[in-house]
Amino acid sequence: MYSPKEYWAGLSERYDSVDSSGLLPILHPEAPLWFNEAIDHIQFRALRRAVEIANFSPGARFLDVGCGTGRWVRRYRELGFSPVGVDATLGMLRVARSHQTACPLAAGLAYNLPFSNDAFDCISDITVVQHIPYELQPEALREMTRVLKPGGIMILLELIRGAGFHIFPRRPEDWIREAESFGVTLIDCFGQEYFFPDRLFAGLTQTLFRRRGSQARGQVMSHDSSSKENSLTRRLYWQMRRIIVPFSVLMEPVFVNILPASAATHAIFVFRKKL
């Protein structure tokens, strides 16, 4: 039985002492650091675009829901805003503080936020609600709109394909419809993490191993694999991806501008709360 709080607590305990970057427990835990840094880079690029679209005033009060190890609240502060982070996992908040996150941090659930109504100019949710079971996702979106000021901005970066044990994506139109049911209006939406060359290579590699009739070996290609007996295969696999991923990162802005959000892995949604 999947429990978001227990799942993330387990990751924070597992990587607290071995990951100085703070990226592994919040992105792809079993992937190499360079891969997580590439994902972090394109996510930050997409988030900057969303922030520019919203045109916030300096000092705007941001709430980062599911702040994890604090990477976004630190960046919001660098951009001149006044961020607050909230996360359900005390271990994540402890890691955030160890990274000199000089912002208020609070413990709380996305679907039961410990803040008053209309408290923030912006709510950001970066790959958080996608990890909440479907039946609780509407409550999380309701809570985020509740603490957002009228006229304020809500930025969501969520998965739109690839469901899994702890991943509950929606199609772009479903994310939009669900959020708008709580009193916000979409002002922009664009894709994030197209990564076509890398997705093609990863998909073909997994298909190859499945066709050889070894499901276990096929699983070694996933981000979450730690199979020791296939360590050589896994190293070769990631060495190939290290060649392909930089090209995917380079092409990302091109794909963002010419392809629909539905062709990407994630989408960014920028909403404004009705006055």
What do the PLM-derived regions correspond to, one by one?
Residues 1-55, 59-66:
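Conserved class I S-adenosyl-L-methionine
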Residues 69-112:
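Class I SAM-dependent methyltransferase SAM/SAH-binding core
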Residues 124:
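A conserved beta-strand element that flanks and buttresses the S-adenosyl-L-methionine
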Residues 138-150:
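A short glycine-rich, Lys/Arg-flanked "PGG" loop and its adjoining helix->strand segment in the class I
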Residues 151-158:
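Conserved beta-strand signature within the Rossmann-like core of class I S-adenosyl-L-methionine
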Residues 168-183:
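Short alpha-helix
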Residues 196-275:
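A C-terminal cap/extension of S-adenosyl-L-methionine-dependent methyltransferases
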